[in-house]
Amino acid sequence: MTRALRLLLVSGALSLGVQQAHAQTADTAHGPVPDSTMLTTAMVDAGRKIFHGRGTCSGCHGDKLQGGPVAPALTGRSWRHIDGSYSAIIDRVDNGLAGTLMVPHPGGIEESQVFLVASYVYAVSHGMAKP
């Protein structure tokens, strides 16, 4: 077997492996859910700004994520409709919750901002950041 053919076979096998790994981790229609261990201070800070700004999240969940008459608190480990995992928070911000005021992409936030808001909520609810 020639060297070129071996390289072609190896690169094809690697490409297939990457595609399969991606397919196994793709938890949303938009690609793989980032791992919560990869959260950075910059992501959390950006998410905080969106949560309290354009996302309008604090209008229902409160300035300190303490909840209110129409939305639950997001500060503890007790969750009303989800398990509090990073992927579940992403899904909720991305898809909303039918029959409630929680709409998909609150405040018209963009897809990339969904992950940032989820980073902030996850970090606060897991004691990694302050509201």
Regions found by a protein language model. Name each.
Residues T25-H52, P131:
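Electrostatic cytochrome c docking/interface patches
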Residues G68-R77, D94-S125, A129-P131:
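Axial heme c-ligation environment in periplasmic c-type cytochrome domains
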Residues G47, R54-D63, V117-V121:
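The canonical Cys-X-X-Cys-His
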Residues G17, T56, H126-G127:
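A generic secondary-structure boundary signal that marks alpha-helix termini
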Residues G53-G59, A73, L101:
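Residue-level recognition of specific faces of alpha-helices
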Residues T41, R48, G62-D94:
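Gly/Gly-Pro-rich "capping" loops immediately C-terminal to redox-active cysteine motifs
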Residues M1-V33, T37:
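N-terminal export/targeting leaders of redox proteins
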